[in-house]
Curated annotation (Swiss-Prot):
InterPro entries: BRICHOS_dom, Gastrokine. Disulfide bonds join 125-185. This is BRICHOS domain-containing protein 5. GO terms for cellular component: extracellular space; membrane.
Length: 260
């Protein structure tokens, strides 16, 4: 006599009739239905999450980083990085000159309409008002950062020089300089600087600093030149920094002390 399988019905004696257990096929059907229900619920959750994410949209980054490779046929390449704050219409250029461990931070602040220079090795900031060309440079920096690609200047990069006269007697109130300038120059004196156009006299780089520049420990450079017009007065060059822009223009910004 063969043993009864799990699918065979086993009648139980009783006056009211015969009761049977569910077959194996029934259990399989119930298990498949439960598995199918779980898969459907998981799929609904994925779709709902995708719809919610698309409704909110991807978060727009406030800061974009633009890294620049700067070829120079005459000197080693500086390390330069540009951090652009699109929401605040501002860009901070960090430049580390060749063979130096000290960086410069140059802030283009579109909200306050100023450019701030902060040499790391000196406890001082230089502030000047933006001109139309500076606003165009800031717009170019913001637009270039949106591409999110490294920018490499072409071989026909134009090099120029900019002289800024530092007015040591005019210290800027940080409360009037704007939030970004305050953050960059925290607990650091800020002095007004202006372009040297209209200034005059010889430019000398080999001389001992005097006044507040001497207190900063600034060392004069071996630079000689001449400003074209006006009364002839000696000018001492103390600090210079080279900055390159996506417009294929590299500028050597030099500061000199304007006597009181």
């Amino acid at each position: 006599m063969e043993p009864a399988s799990c699918c065979a019905e086993r009648p139980k004696p009783g006056p009211t009739g015969v009761k049977t257990k569910p077959s194996c096929g029934g259990w399989r059907a119930v298990s498949l239905l439960l598995l199918l229900l779980l898969l459907v619920l998981a799929a609904v959750g994925v779709v709902a999450g995708g719809l919610l994410g698309s409704a909110q949209g991807p978060p727009k980054p406030r800061l974009q980083t633009l890294r620049m490779t700067l070829p120079s046929p005459h000197m080693p390449r500086p390390n330069q990085t540009i951090l652009v704050d699109v929401a605040r219409n501002a860009a901070t250029i960090t430049v580390t000159p060749p063979q130096s461990n000290h960086s410069w931070a140059v802030l283009f602040d579109g909200q306050s309409g100023c450019i701030c220079y902060r040499p790391e090795e000196h406890q001082v900031c230089f502030l000047r008002l933006m001109e139309d060309s500076d606003r165009e440079t800031l717009r170019l920096l913001v637009d270039t950062s949106k591409v999110q690609e490294a920018w490499v200047p072409s071989q026909d990069t134009h090099h120029t020089q900019e002289l800024l006269a530092v007015q040591g007697s005019l210290e800027v109130d940080p409360a009037q300089a704007g939030a970004l300038v305050q953050r960059l120059c925290m607990r650091t004196p800020i002095y007004w600087a202006r372009r040297a156009e209209g200034e005059s006299g010889p430019l000398w780089g080999k001389a001992r600093p005097s006044g507040w520049f001497e207190e900063l420990g600034a060392e004069p450079l071996e630079i000689h030149g001449t400003l074209a017009t006006g009364p002839r007065r000696q000018r001492l060059i103390y600090l210079c920094i080279d900055i390159c822009f996506p417009s294929n223009i590299c500028v050597s910004v030099c500061f000199y002390y304007l006597p009181d």
